[in-house]
């Protein structure tokens, strides 16, 4: 486990150094939070997203905010509210090595966001997504939601699904046809390892695909 942890940290550092973010792009990525639910905004569709390990904000820049923006483009911004999972979900590296590929505090935090959507926006349809460790957070959370909430979750997208092998490409106790797993060629976390390759950082490219899937699962 220590060797894997070291390899994961080294890989993150190597990829970051090899691909420095230009200043204009870095500026654009400052918008990495979405708190519509917390701010009391209810719209026909609510997207709940859990970011990947080490990402800043509560949505992250690689898959979370791009998916939120693409879904707003697909359905109209007036129809989509976005909420990231923050708080106790700190997106730190160590929980990846636990049996659930995340920790219980993160799962409880995400569960609370789904409960918030259910109580504050009872007429909204819920869609969800997660990237990297965030995909494990969503997997573990959604499978144990009470049916009254789970039945409102119309679709889920999982990018770089760290439990893809363990859970056979699906979320247990949730309809497979309502789940889209997006795994890039060469992303080794999708085949049961925690080795980070450059492919694991490419999911911004898949945000439109993910948004189209989620849009097809709801009616507005």
Curated annotation (Swiss-Prot):
Annotated positions for site Transition state stabilizer: 53, 133
Protein's job: Catalyzes the hydrolysis of complex carboxylic polyesters found in the cell wall of plants. Degrades cutin, a macromolecule that forms the structure of the plant cuticle.
Enzyme's top EC category: hydrolase
Keyword check for Hydrolase: yes
One family name in Pfam for this protein: Cutinase
GO cellular component, one term: extracellular region
GO function term, MF aspect, one: cutinase activity
Organism: Aspergillus terreus (strain NIH 2624 / FGSC A1156)
PROSITE patterns: CUTINASE_1, CUTINASE_2
Localization annotation: Secreted
Protein's recorded name: Probable cutinase 5
Record GO biological process: carbohydrate catabolic process
